[in-house]
């Protein structure tokens, strides 16, 4: 049970872009007339509904054709195409699936890139064009090991037999950066050594909409950091 709960919460870190500042960047574009609590609830609900709909489609299809639904990237590029081949109109379903996968990948790239671009503009005063050009070169170079890990660098198995460079990068991001980044954000918002609870409440409740309640202060300050830390430790226990 704990493994499933930990995996689900880890997935939430990824899909909601927690711990890497993407939500903060998009939140900065919302004017002061709208409170952040209602916006955050709407995003979380919509994300959950999309995940449930995807699960209702993918899992029955995998079980019907006797394939493993937990095969990671192979599920997208090997397993599901084989499932589509067994369905009437396989070319249409396959084409639509990868088309929508491209849209999903593009939206993710935009979210992550916007965070990096805004960081470069605010910290170093770069123009948007300069920030895009330089970051595109750097990210392309950093992406090469992942791409080459499936062919000419396939002999590199950093996490054991059968693993790839992508598995290592996924472990670094999903099991380290996302939970630890979320923990830093959380402690910054509630700790007197950071922004502080009062400043957080003032900012969260500015404007119109759903107010952020005061009653979960103890939970957010003391219990929630322990939950995030547990997810981080659980990821290492399952991996090693």
PLM regions and their residue ranges:
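Transmembrane alpha-helical segments in integral membrane proteins
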Residues: 17-32, 103-118, 182-200, 239
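Membrane-interface segments at loop-to-transmembrane junctions
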Residues: 38-46, 207-218
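Membrane-embedded translocation segments of transport machinery
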Residues: 1-106, 130-131, 138
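Transmembrane helix-loop junctions in multi-pass membrane proteins
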Residues: 1-2, 31-34, 57-70, 88-92, ...
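Hydrophobic alpha-helical segments of multi-pass membrane transport proteins
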Residues: 106-111, 132-135, 139-150, 167-202
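A generic transmembrane alpha-helix motif of multi-pass inner-membrane proteins
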Residues: 158, 162-187, 209-240
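Alpha-helical transmembrane segments
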Residues: 112-126, 161, 165, 187-213
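Loop-to-transmembrane helix boundary motifs in multi-pass membrane proteins
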Residues: 46-52, 91-94, 103-106, 120-156, ...
């Amino acid at each position: 049970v704990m493994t499933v709960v930990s995996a689900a919460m880890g997935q939430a870190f990824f899909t909601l872009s927690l711990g890497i500042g993407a939500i903060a960047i998009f939140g900065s574009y919302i004017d002061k007339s709208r409170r952040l609590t209602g916006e955050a609830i709407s995003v979380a609900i919509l994300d959950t509904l999309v995940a449930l709909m995807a699960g209702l489609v993918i899992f029955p299809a995998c079980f019907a054709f006797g394939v493993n639904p937990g095969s990671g990237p192979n599920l997208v590029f090997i397993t599901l195409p084989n499932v589509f081949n067994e369905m009437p109109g396989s070319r249409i379903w396959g084409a639509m699936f990868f088309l929508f996968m491209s849209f999903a990948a593009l939206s993710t790239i935009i979210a992550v890139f916007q965070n990096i671009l805004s960081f470069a503009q605010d910290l170093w005063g770069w123009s948007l064009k300069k920030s895009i050009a330089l970051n595109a070169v750097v990210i392309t170079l950093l992406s090469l090991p992942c791409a080459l890990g499936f062919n000419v660098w396939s002999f590199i198995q950093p996490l054991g037999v059968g693993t790839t460079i992508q598995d290592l990068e996924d472990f670094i991001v999903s099991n380290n950066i996302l939970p630890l980044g979320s923990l830093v954000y959380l402690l910054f918002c509630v700790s007197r050594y950071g922004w502080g609870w009062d400043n957080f409440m003032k900012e969260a409740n500015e404007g119109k909409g759903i107010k952020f309640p005061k009653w979960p202060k103890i939970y957010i300050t003391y219990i929630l950091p322990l939950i995030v830390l547990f997810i981080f430790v659980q990821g290492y226990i399952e991996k090693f």
